[in-house]
Amino acid sequence: MIYLFGASGHGLVILDILHRLNRPVQAFIDDADKPALFGGIPVIKSNELHLAASDELIISIGSNAARWKVAQKLAGSLFTSAIHPIAILSETVIVQDGSVVMAGAVLNPYAKVGQHCIINTGATIDHECELGDFVHISPNATLCGNVRVGNHSWVAAGAVVIPGVTIGKRAIVGAGAVVLKDVPDGAVVVGNPAHIKSENKWVM
């Protein structure tokens, strides 16, 4: 069975993917006050979770930082990925455990996606891109070829990153930004062309 950690809107999208793949979800896990059912699926507290060795998990939380914190608590668990049937992935693409790929996303040859990443609706990850762990590429964002994205970074909706650019760890690329040069670790960049606006102060 599969459990989804986080009864959220993002969780509903993952639930839909798994339903389309005929992979049954046993329950959402959420310690906040939630209804007994969410998306037609039971919601349980983490202290009610008793995993069998074969049970699988996906952390269904959009925030990179929150996803990382949950992953630390659940270290040693069996994580699985979910890839929408109308996403387009080259046969040479690597998507690691815990990551999700939404409808309409395109991942081209030799792209690599780390653990617990989100490749959101309609995002494009072009040839030979490499994404670290806990990365979120938002809807309709475009990474051109040979882009590198460091752990815990977020590329927001509609942003474009030109070929060969490196985005550092914990960086944030604002919605609609056009990134023409490398982005340092922890930088928040916005605009066209993208420029540094502030610092992402989240520290692991």
Language-model-derived ranges and their functions:
Residues A82-K197:
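Structural signal for interior beta-strand "rungs" in well-ordered beta-sheet cores
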Residues G6, I58-G62, P163:
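Small/polar loops that bind or transfer phosphate-bearing groups
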Residues G9, A65-A66, V178:
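Short alpha-helical
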Residues I196-M204:
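Generic C-terminal helix-cap and adjacent flexible tail
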Residues M1-L51, S99:
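Hydrophobic, well-ordered beta-alpha structural blocks that scaffold small-molecule cofactor pockets
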Residues L15-I17, K69-K73, V113, P184-D185, ...:
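Short amphipathic alpha-helical segments
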Residues G6, L57, F79, D126-H127:
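Generic structural signal for conserved hydrophobic packing positions in ordered secondary structure
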Residues D33-S90:
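Phosphate-bearing ligand-interacting subdomains
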